[in-house]
């Protein structure tokens, strides 16, 4: 049975999760909630997308609900997650994509309205984090879980592959990251992050990220061995992980490429991709993989010290994994 899904927060990730749900048919979205968007505006925002293009299906408003390709999706406008009547629509698996309710306690408010499980589409301070292809098999039935971050979803499959094969001693990551909705179009106030308040489309902006350290949470043997930072760049979508790593074993760059290619065609197929083409960022737009290893972009200094680079659509690939995680946990919950 296809899991019935509700989405709280109809922003970039909320809308792209819905696109992925419709594209795959793997889950059925039956309800949406966003207190800041009324149904006609939600229709417009979903239909027209500057990054991923116009929605090719049929969408209209009927009363207070959306009807997409003939299927009704309940639309709520509650500010408090505890007041969202998920049970009325049959939504059991809730995608928490507001970026606000990212702790177990805050996300648990959804249960008051009839939710069965909450999947936070962001890193969480205390909810178990899962990265598909890396540690989903450790899922133990927690009712609030996290899909980690888009950058962790790019780095972790790569790090797992390299660590399993060659043993990582230590690694540093730089995420060359497209700007996001949290940034400013022109210089503006940002008291906690002064650089982050500068104009997104005009600047390269060094920033912090917990994505690399989070790899240690999903791959415990790498805890304390990997860290990183990010640079926000003036592009609207698609990012690039630059991972410099020291191995315990002697290895050539060709062996690194071969290991990643093997993983991309085997256990990580559909999650980790491999390319030897001379691609640039727009070539990854709307790509559903978590991570696309760029074989030509990496380099080795010696037999232990290597730089690898991997692309990711930080919206689309990440949102596809949200859908995949829901499918996975729903099967586990059903005892399959």
UniProtKB/Swiss-Prot annotation:
Keyword Iron: no
Active site per UniProt: 150
EC number: 1.2.1.12
Main EC class the enzyme belongs to: oxidoreductase
Annotated control of activity: Inhibited by koningic acid through the interaction of cysteine residues with koningic acid even at very low concentrations.
Positions of D-glyceraldehyde 3-phosphate binding: 149-151, 180, 209-210, 232
GO CC aspect terms: cytosol
Entry-linked Pfam families: Gp_dh_C, Gp_dh_N
Keywords: Cytoplasm, Glycolysis, NAD, Oxidoreductase
Binding positions for NAD(+) per the UniProt entry: 12-13, 34, 79, 314
Location(s), subcellular: Cytoplasm
Top-rank lineage group of the source organism: Eukaryota
Pathway assigned in UniProt: Carbohydrate degradation; glycolysis; pyruvate from D-glyceraldehyde 3-phosphate: step 1/5
Keyword NAD found: yes
SMART domains the UniProt entry points to: Gp_dh_N (SM00846)
Molecular function (Gene Ontology), one example: glyceraldehyde-3-phosphate dehydrogenase (NAD+) (phosphorylating) activity
Signal peptide coordinates: none
Site features described as Activates thiol group during catalysis, chain residue numbers: 177
GO term, biological process aspect, one: glycolytic process
Catalytic reactions on record: D-glyceraldehyde 3-phosphate + phosphate + NAD(+) = (2R)-3-phospho-glyceroyl phosphate + NADH + H(+)
Family: Belongs to the glyceraldehyde-3-phosphate dehydrogenase family.
Assembly information from the UniProt record: Homotetramer.
General remark: This protein is a koningic acid (antibiotic)-resistant GAPDH isozyme. It is present under antibiotic production.
Protein known as: Glyceraldehyde-3-phosphate dehydrogenase 1
Gene coding for it: gpd1
């Amino acid at each position: 049975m296809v899991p019935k899904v509700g989405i709280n927060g109809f922003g970039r990730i909320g809308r792209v999760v819905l696109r992925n749900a419709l594209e795959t048919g793997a889950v059925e979205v039956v309800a949406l909630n966003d207190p800041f968007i009324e149904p006609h505006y939600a229709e417009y925002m979903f239909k027209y997308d500057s990054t991923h293009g116009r929605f090719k299906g049929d969408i209209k408003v009927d009363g207070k609900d959306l009807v997409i390709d003939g299927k009704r999706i309940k639309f709520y406008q509650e500010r408090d997650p505890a007041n969202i009547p998920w049970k009325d629509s049959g939504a059991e698996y809730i995608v928490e994509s507001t970026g606000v309710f990212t702790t177990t306690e805050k996300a648990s408010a959804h249960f008051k309205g009839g939710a069965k499980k909450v999947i936070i589409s962001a890193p969480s301070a205390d909810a178990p984090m899962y990265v598909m292809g890396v540690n989903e098999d450790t899922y133990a039935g927690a009712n609030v879980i996290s899909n980690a971050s888009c950058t962790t979803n790019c780095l972790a499959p790569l790090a797992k592959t390299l660590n399993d094969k060659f043993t990582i001693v230590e690694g540093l990551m730089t995420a060359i990251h497209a700007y996001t909705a949290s940034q400013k179009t022109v210089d503006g106030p940002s008291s906690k992050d002064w650089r982050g308040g500068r104009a997104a489309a005009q600047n390269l902006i060094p920033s912090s990220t917990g994505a690399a350290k989070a790899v240690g949470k999903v791959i415990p043997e790498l805890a304390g061995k990997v860290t990183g930072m990010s640079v926000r760049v003036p592009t609207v979508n698609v990012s690039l992980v630059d991972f410099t790593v020291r191995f315990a074993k002697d290895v050539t760059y060709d062996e690194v490429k071969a290991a990643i290619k093997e993983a991309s065609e085997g256990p990580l197929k559909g999650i980790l991709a491999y390319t030897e083409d001379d691609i640039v960022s727009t070539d990854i737009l709307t790509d559903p993989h978590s991570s696309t290893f760029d074989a030509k972009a990496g380099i080795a200094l010696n037999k232990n010290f290597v730089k690898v680079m991997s692309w990711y659509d930080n919206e689309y690939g990440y949102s596809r994994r949200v859908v995949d995680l829901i499918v996975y946990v729903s099967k586990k919950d059903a005892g399959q």
